[in-house]
Amino acid sequence: MSTKKERLDAICGIIQTKVISNQEELLKELEDSGFSVTQATLSRDIKQLKVAKVHDGNGDYVYRLPEESISKQAQPEGKKKPNIEFSGNLAVVKTRPGYAMGIASDIDSHAPSEILATIAGDDTILVIPRNGVSQEKVIAALSHFI
């Protein structure tokens, strides 16, 4: 019997090394690696890992891990710079293609007190702060998600 951490590590490894375009393919790869997983469990794991389906440039969509999961150890904590720009009190966050909706959903579900709402496209998030919240506080609130 494998632990959840082992299964999550296996999912990350498979997504990083193989072209996976749906849960069925990922389930098969996990089974080939010795993991017995239901589709419901896999779906929860994918959500927990914040796996996104992104366009691969060939007309297909494939699973990708968020950039922070892949390069978290490679980038020292002090060197992280989110790509956030402001227009008045509105913040615009640029992400990798396909990641904006997942990140915006994460922000909305955690509901930081500084953020009123988000609107997401494919690679851009419009962040609407609450009245009177400074840009510095918005950046601090968003830094937990990007």
From Swiss-Prot:
InterPro entries: Arg_repress, Arg_repress_C, Arg_repress_C_sf, Arg_repress_DNA-bd, WH-like_DNA-bd_sf, WH_DNA-bd_sf
Protein location: Cytoplasm
A GO cellular-component term linked to this record: cytoplasm
Pfam families in alphabetical order: Arg_repressor, Arg_repressor_C
Domain of life from the UniProt record: Bacteria
GO biological process terms held by the UniProt record: L-arginine biosynthetic process; protein complex oligomerization; regulation of arginine biosynthetic process
Keyword RNA-binding carried by entry: no
Molecular functions (GO terms): arginine binding; DNA binding; DNA-binding transcription factor activity
Pathway terms, separated by semicolons: Amino-acid biosynthesis; L-arginine biosynthesis [regulation]
Keywords linked to the UniProt accession: Amino-acid biosynthesis, Arginine biosynthesis, Cytoplasm, DNA-binding, Repressor, Transcription, Transcription regulation
Function field: Regulates arginine biosynthesis genes.
PANTHER family recorded: ARGININE REPRESSOR
HAMAP family, A to Z: Arg_repressor
The family this protein is said to belong to: Belongs to the ArgR family.
Protein name: Arginine repressor
